[in-house]
Amino acid sequence: MRRNSSLWRLTGLATAVLRLPEEPGAYVLGASKQTLRRKIRLANRLGISWEEVEDEQERRDLLKLANSCERSHPDATYRIPVPGNDDLLDYRLWLVARAADGRPLLLSVTPVDGELAMLRYFRTLGWGEDQSQARYFMTEVLVERLVSLGVRYLIDGSNLFWLPNGVRHFQQMTGFHIVRVRVGRLRRRALPAT
């Protein structure tokens, strides 16, 4: 879309953003997060755990599994015949949720740059109750990890025009808000003549 197009002037760049708290533990506080807390407690009862993935071979194995799950998703809305995830290996922050038996349930890959982070990949690795609960559990895990890194904003760069209703509902439930981002050049102020 050209920057001077009518649609650009009308919408700017609209995207979902989660403003992160400054203090650890603050994300799940408040009445608006009651359902999120309930889902996290259920995930804990199911024995869901998480770990940060730093081993390159394990990352490649998880990427292979993620691509396979995208190609074979039972819901055509979420199925991606040719996943484009090779860039994930370029990013440092990899988190995985695991079932009580050790199976990977969800993969989260998030590029971080100062106070900003981009939700590049946040998908379940299979289908079922464990995977569903892992989404909520891992949202809190990701937020807490990002807060520890000094991140203030988590951006979901998904195309809002084509976002499935299930993902839109999940974003609202976890605290994402649609914001309009204006992209522009920094203007340098002229220094006074001496």
Map each language-model feature to its residues.
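Internal, well-ordered alpha/beta segment that forms a basic, Gly-enriched binding/recognition surface
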Residues: 1-31, 48
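Acyl-donor binding region in acyl/amide transferases
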Residues: 1-8, 29, 55, 113-178
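Conserved catalytic-core motifs of GNAT/GCN5-like acyltransferases
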Residues: 15-16, 177-190
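Short, well-ordered beta-strand micro-motif
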Residues: 17-19, 96-98, 185
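A conserved beta-strand-loop-helix scaffold within acyl/acetyltransferase catalytic domains
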Residues: 23-131, 140, 145-146
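Positions that flank functional sites
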Residues: 58, 161, 186
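Short secondary-structure transition/capping segments
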Residues: 62-65, 166-168, 191-194
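Flexible glycine/acidic-rich beta-alpha junction loops that bind and position SAM and/or redox cofactors
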Residues: 128, 164, 184-193
